[in-house]
Amino acid sequence: MEQLAQRVEDLEMKLAFQESTIDVLDQQVIKLNDLLAEQQHQLRVLISKLQSVEPSNMATQAEETPPPHY
């Protein structure tokens, strides 16, 4: 009977440890989810800013006339 009580106690300890681990991991998932949402917002802002940039008035290298010595 003592062996059974010891096994039950061991299982209760393992369960308590697993519950604690799950709580810690749950908090990490929440933090990472918040971080991901923030980074997605920053990326959307950056994309918006890049799309609103005026194209350069300088000609591309393909549009440039070659120098006279060619």
From Swiss-Prot:
Top-rank taxon, per record: Bacteria
Coiled coil: none
InterPro entries linked: SlyX (IPR007236)
Cysteines joined through disulfide linkages: none
Protein family: Belongs to the SlyX family.
Protein name: Protein SlyX homolog
Organism the protein comes from: Shewanella woodyi (strain ATCC 51908 / MS32)
Gene: slyX
